[in-house]
């Protein structure tokens, strides 16, 4: 039965979950994932699509592009947006559990645990949370960059990584913040992680002298030199925070 009453907080949480996982431009009633979620919630695909667009209107980057939802959208929409953006760690995890419960599944059904049989209690619960959130973060970052490397535009998802700008080991509170993420291919992710490349405040790629001295190598000429000084491909939403990029340049990048 199709619902017509007001949206609940639980429903909006799972709609925002989908908002994070779909590339911008796919928030429409004909999208298979929109239709699937509408069926789960007992809503029409049009209603779910409209909620997705309403969430988009809160994103500062999309606001600059003139993206608008309903002029008088629900205050609860804004509440959910703010809650996620203030606490990605908990809300992402909660949204995965709510969605899994609605589908009658385990939130970690598709996630493999190498030593799961040896874990118990809080230790296992903590690992589950980390893995569930890692999976969510990856989907969010890849979708925001339309499944392309920000440096070379490689479009193969199996070769893409949701790179953290400020590493987990430095600030665990940022590990789920999408503004602390960049989608990169495996090559450029490793170079970024090792400080061989970075990004300036104009979102242009900078390359370490460690790489530049190898400029005669064909692999370096193909994989790095063409992108130096070029603006990286920016995401449709959750643009990298400049203060995180500054941290990377000052603490990880090798000039």
Roles of regions detected by a PLM:
Residues 33-38:
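Short alpha-helical "recognition helix" segments of helix-turn-helix
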């Amino acid at each position: 039965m199709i619902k017509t009453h007001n949206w609940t907080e639980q429903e909006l949480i799972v709609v925002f979950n989908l908002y994070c996982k779909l590339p911008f431009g796919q928030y429409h009633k004909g999208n298979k994932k929109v239709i699937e979620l509408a069926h789960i919630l007992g809503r029409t695909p049009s209603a779910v699509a409209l909620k997705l667009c309403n969430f988009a209107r809160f994103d500062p980057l999309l606001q600059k592009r003139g993206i608008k939802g309903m002029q008088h959208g629900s205050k609860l929409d804004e509440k959910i947006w703010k809650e996620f953006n203030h606490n990605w760690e908990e809300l992402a995890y909660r949204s995965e559990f709510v969605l899994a419960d609605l589908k009658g599944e385990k939130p970690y059904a598709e996630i493999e645990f190498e030593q799961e049989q040896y874990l118990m209690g809080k230790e296992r619960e903590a690992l589950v949370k980390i893995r569930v959130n890692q999976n969510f973060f990856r989907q969010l970052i890849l979708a925001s960059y339309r499944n392309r490397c920000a440096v070379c535009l490689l479009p193969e998802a199996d070769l893409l990584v949701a790179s953290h700008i400020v590493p987990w080991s430095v600030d665990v509170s940022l590990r789920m913040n999408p503004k602390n993420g960049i989608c990169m291919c495996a090559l450029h992710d490793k170079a970024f992680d090792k400080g061989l490349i970075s990004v300036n405040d104009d979102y242009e790629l900078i390359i370490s002298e460690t790489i530049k001295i190898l400029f005669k190598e064909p692999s370096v000429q193909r994989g790095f030199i063409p992108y130096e000084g070029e603006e990286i491909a920016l995401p449709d939403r959750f643009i990298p925070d400049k203060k995180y990029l500054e941290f990377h340049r000052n603490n990880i990048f090798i000039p």
